[in-house]
């Protein structure tokens, strides 16, 4: 549902049915909800007890993440490591944006996760210790590359629309998710 709203917003803005500013608001709200279906898929909840429907988890999870330009496989693998090593500064991929001084710092840190190299180093070490994690990161990396290419094509074709319907909503939504789903639940924990 959320992805349909997001992609429909693009079509309506490009066709001139709704103004870009309205599309920005709709896209931002839609993108803020993009992680929830993926999270359910990461835990296998979308298929539930029906193992023959396990394919639904990554399919719905990945489609829902298109507005966030994220790989479901990467987020699944890192999220499982987060559960396995919650609050461990050496092994919890969420540690650097959960253990900060406040919500604003959480919003900033979650948007620059790979900027200072700490997360990349942690992921590299986790991959060395866990071949399945390394495989997931490789598969997800390919999806991430497709998103990079798609973002560049969109930016060249529809520059202002890409800025206000994809890039900025993604940054706002990532900040929101970092605050609400990472920082707030973990801020009082050791």
Task: Label every model-predicted segment.
Residues 1-28, 33, 37, 62-168:
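Non-catalytic, topology-defining segments of multipass membrane proteins
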Residues 28-41, 71, 167-190:
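Transmembrane alpha-helical segments that form the membrane-embedded catalytic/substrate-channel core
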Residues 15-16, 40-49, 82, 183-188:
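Membrane-interface elements of multi-pass transporters and channels
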Residues 58-59, 87-90, 97, 174-176, ...:
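Short, surface-exposed linear patches
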């Amino acid at each position: 549902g959320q992805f349909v709203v997001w992609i429909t917003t693009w079509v309506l803005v490009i066709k001139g049915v709704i103004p870009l500013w309205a599309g920005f608001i709709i896209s931002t709200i839609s993108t803020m909800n993009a992680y929830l279906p993926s999270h359910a898929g990461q835990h296998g909840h979308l298929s539930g007890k029906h193992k023959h429907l396990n394919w639904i988890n990554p399919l719905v999870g990945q489609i829902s993440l298109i507005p966030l330009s994220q790989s479901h496989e990467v987020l699944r693998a890192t999220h499982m490591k987060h559960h396995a090593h919650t609050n461990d500064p050496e092994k919890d991929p969420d540690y650097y944006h959960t253990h900060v001084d406040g919500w604003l710092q959480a919003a900033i840190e979650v948007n620059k996760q790979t900027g200072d190299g700490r997360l990349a180093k942690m992921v590299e070490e986790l991959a060395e210790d866990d071949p399945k994690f390394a495989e997931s990161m490789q598969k997800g990396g390919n999806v991430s590359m497709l998103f990079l290419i798609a973002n560049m094509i969109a930016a060249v074709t529809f520059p202002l629309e890409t800025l206000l319907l994809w890039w900025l909503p993604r940054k706002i939504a990532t900040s929101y998710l970092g605050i609400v789903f990472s920082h707030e639940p973990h801020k009082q924990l050791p």
